[in-house]
Each structure stands twice: as structure tokens, then as C-alpha cells.
Regions:
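Amphipathic alpha-helical coiled-coil segments
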Residues: 37-52, 169, 173-194, 210, ...
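Periplasmic alpha-helical coiled-coil/stalk elements that build and connect Gram-negative outer-membrane
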Residues: 153-159, 163-283, 393, 397-400
């Protein structure tokens, strides 16, 4: 059995890649599936924010209807005869819309131009019209929250949260790789010790066997040596299995082929650094990214409360429209007698009774905020406990190294 393991180890050693901790971390950062997914999520958040910021710039639109034709037969009951109406038209509309981030309103400049030719085949009458309409329009919500600014702020928080998640994922990968790197090294040393022990037991067995054959010791000692040798061989087999299992898990974490054989070389030259527990706790509370993520969640809860309060709320909008309307049967005379158009209006939405739906939604959002606040406080306590525990264990860990 041991011979098979040794031959297998030699075969693997021919194509073995030796990894340092730095090289293992570099491979993990490049190949880790979870880190790649986190980076994709970060890029998505960046694109969402970029799209929202682009939507706040002037939007240009062009609508063209090159040609439209219709023919309709109509019956006049009074004159008891049929009329054939024929209509041809063409139109184009150019619009420029500018959102107003500070007020959540929009300003639009719309330029419409159309041509229409209508004829009655029965009477022989024809009417041709060229029309140009230029208007400036304003739409402004009132008595409600600014949805545009809130959406932009939410996307900024989402991007910051994605950046924090990516950084945390990197730290988790670094910790996991470091832990498993030294686990592989530990199993590697355990296997080496087990093989050395096997060689010692084999030599001891050969010595006792020679002594038994020479009649210098009793046969019982040979039996005990055989038991010790078999136990040592079994230990080598167990350590070999444990070593291969740990290596497979490590290769899976690094994102490399499971068929590739590896070995690790750690750096055991550790420079001790004195840690002040009080300063360590203070630094952790200031820098831990998990706490910032919790703070972002609390800010997003405030947005949820605002939206809940806006359900069935009293709100309104102001709309205004000024422009010029010009038309004529001859395109050259369209602007001879233009007319001015002005329009302004206020609309209000007044809720009367909603059976308590708005109140329940607000209460639900407030309870969610309260729950997340408790989670935030508990996270701070847990961080303090973890840092204190690590500081207490540092002398023990240093002695183990």
C-alpha cells in the first residue's frame, strides 16, 4: 500500500507547481468565481449610475411619419348620398427634453411640422394645409418628494455598497486562501512526519527481526514491532488522504484545475507587531466596511419610509405651455399670420380614504428601519468582541508560529 502511495507521489511530483502565499493570492484574485461575480455586480452598479446620470442630460427625440393615406366612404342620411373622403398626410416632430434634478420637473421644446391634403371626390373639393407648431412646455410636480434626486442617491448608495462588497470579498478571499494555504502546509508536514515515523518503525522492525533470528530477543517483541509497523503504515495512508483532500479544496478556492498537483512553501519569518487593544477596537469601528454597509441600509430605509408616506398623498402638478402655431395652404405663406398659444394649469390629487393602507405601509417601513438599526448596533458589539478576542489570542498564535 505504501509503495503505491510513494509511486503516486513521485508521479505527481514530476509536474508539481510550488506556490508561495503571494502567488496563491494572485491566482485566487484572478480566478476566484465569487470574486469575479462580485466584480460583475460592481460594474453593473457603475453602469446603472452612469445611465441615470446620462438621463439627467438633455434628451433628443425625432419622430417621423413620412406618408399616410386613407380613403373612406361615408353615407349622408340627410342628402341620401355617398361621399368619398380621401386624406394624405406627412409629419415630423423634433423634441428636446431637459429634466430638472433640483425640482423634479421637466422642460421640453417641441417642434412639429405637418402637411395634409384632404379631398372629397364626390364634391370635388380639395384642402391642403401646411402646419408648423413650436412650443415650450414645463411640467413641475408639487407637494411631493423629489423622485429624481432620490433615485440618483439610491444608485450612488448601490454603487458604494457594491464597492464595499467587492473589497470585503477580496479580504475574505485573502483570509480563506491564507487559512487553506497553511492547512496544506500543515498536512504536508504531517505527511512528512508520518513517512519518517514509518521509516523508523521499518528500521526497528528489521533490527528486532534480526535479533529474533539470532535468538537474542523473544518472538513477542517481533509481533509488537509488526503491529507498530502496520500502524505507522496506516498513519501514512491517512495523512496522504488528508493531504490530497486539503489540496483539492485549496485548488478549488484558487480556481485552478483539480488535476494540477501543487505544493506550498510558506514564509515563517514573522515580525511581531505590538497591538494596543483599545486602539485596535477604535480603528475597527472606524474602518470596518460591514458597518458602512449597515449605515447605507439605514439610509435606504429612510427612502422607503418617504415612499410609504407618499402613498395616496396629497400632491399636484403645474403645467405650462407657450408657443407659436402657423398654418396655410401654401408653404411659402405659413408664417404670414402665426398665432400665439399660451396655456397654464394646476392639477391636484386629493386622497379621501384608503382604509388605513398608507398608515400600515409607513409603519411597516419604520419597523424595518428599527430592525436594521438593531442589527447595526449588534454588528458593532460583535466587532468589538472579535477584536478583543483576537488581541487576547495574539501571544498564543505567535508562539504557535
Amino acid at each position: 500500500m505504501l509503495a503505491v502511495l510513494l509511486i503516486s507521489g513521485i508521479a505527481h511530483g514530476m509536474a508539481q507547481e510550488v506556490l508561495t502565499l503571494e502567488k496563491a493570492l494572485e491566482i485566487a484574485f484572478q480566478n476566484s468565481p465569487s470574486l469575479i461575480q462580485s466584480k460583475i455586480s460592481l460594474e453593473r452598479s457603475q453602469m446603472n449610475l452612469k445611465a441615470q446620470e446620462a438621463s439627467l442630460k438633455s434628451q433628443f427625440s425625432l419622430s417621423v411619419n413620412p406618408f399616410n393615406y386613407s380613403r373612406q366612404n361615408s353615407y349622408d342620411d340627410y342628402n341620401s348620398q355617398w361621399y368619398i373622403n380621401q386624406n394624405m398626410s406627412s409629419s415630423a416632430s423634433l423634441g428636446i427634453t431637459q429634466p430638472i434634478k433640483w425640482t423634479d420637473g421637466t422642460v421640453s421644446l417641441v417642434n412639429d411640422f405637418s402637411w395634409q391634403d384632404a379631398s372629397n371626390k364626390t364634391s370635388g373639393k380639395t384642402n391642403t394645409t401646411f402646419r408648423h407648431n413650436l412650443s415650450l412646455r414645463l411640467n413641475q410636480p408639487i407637494f411631493t418628494y423629489n423622485q429624481t434626486k432620490m433615485q440618483l442617491k439610491e444608485l450612488e448608495y448601490a454603487l458604494e455598497n457594491a464597492q464595499l462588497s467587492y473589497a470585503l470579498k477580496q479580504l475574505n478571499i485573502e483570509k480563506s486562501v491564507t487559512d487553506q494555504f497553511y492547512s496544506v502546509y500543515q498536512r504536508q508536514k504531517d505527511l512528512s512526519i508520518a513517512k519518517d515515523e514509518y521509516q523508523n518503525q521499518k528500521q526497528n522492525y528489521d533490527i528486532i527481526k534480526n535479533k529474533v533470528e539470532a535468538g537474542l530477543v523473544a518472538k513477542e517483541e517481533l509481533y509488537q514491532a509488526e503491529v507498530n509497523l502496520a500502524s505507522s503504515e496506516s498513519s501514512v495512508y491517512s495523512q496522504e488522504i488528508s493531504y490530497e483532500n486539503v489540496k483539492d479544496n485549496f485548488k478549488l478556492l484558487l480556481g485552478i484545475s483539480l488535476d494540477e498537483d501543487i505544493a506550498v512553501i510558506p514564509n515563517t519569518d514573522i515580525v511581531p507587531v505590538e497591538v494596543n487593544p483599545i486602539e485596535a477596537v477604535k480603528h475597527a469601528l472606524d474602518q470596518r466596511m460591514e458597518l458602512r454597509q449597515q449605515e447605507i441600509t439605514l439610509e435606504q430605509d429612510q427612502f422607503s419610509i418617504i415612499r410609504a408616506k407618499a402613498t395616496n398623498e396629497f400632491k399636484g402638478s403645474i403645467s405650462a405651455n407657450v408657443g407659436m402655431n402657423a398654418f396655410d395652404s401654401n408653404v411659402k405663406n405659413v408664417y404670414d399670420k402665426p398665432t400665439d398659444n399660451e396655456q397654464i394649469g394646476i392639477s391636484l390629487s386629493i386622497p379621501i380614504f384608503d382604509w388605513g393602507a398608507r398608515k400600515a405601509r409607513v409603519k411597516s417601513a419604520e419597523l424595518a428601519h428599527e430592525s436594521n438599526q438593531i442589527s447595526f448596533d449588534e454588528e458593532k458589539k460583535q466587532i468589538i468582541l472579535d477584536v478583543r478576542s483576537i488581541c487576547r489570542n495574539l501571544p498564543t498564535l505567535l508562539s504557535q508560529i
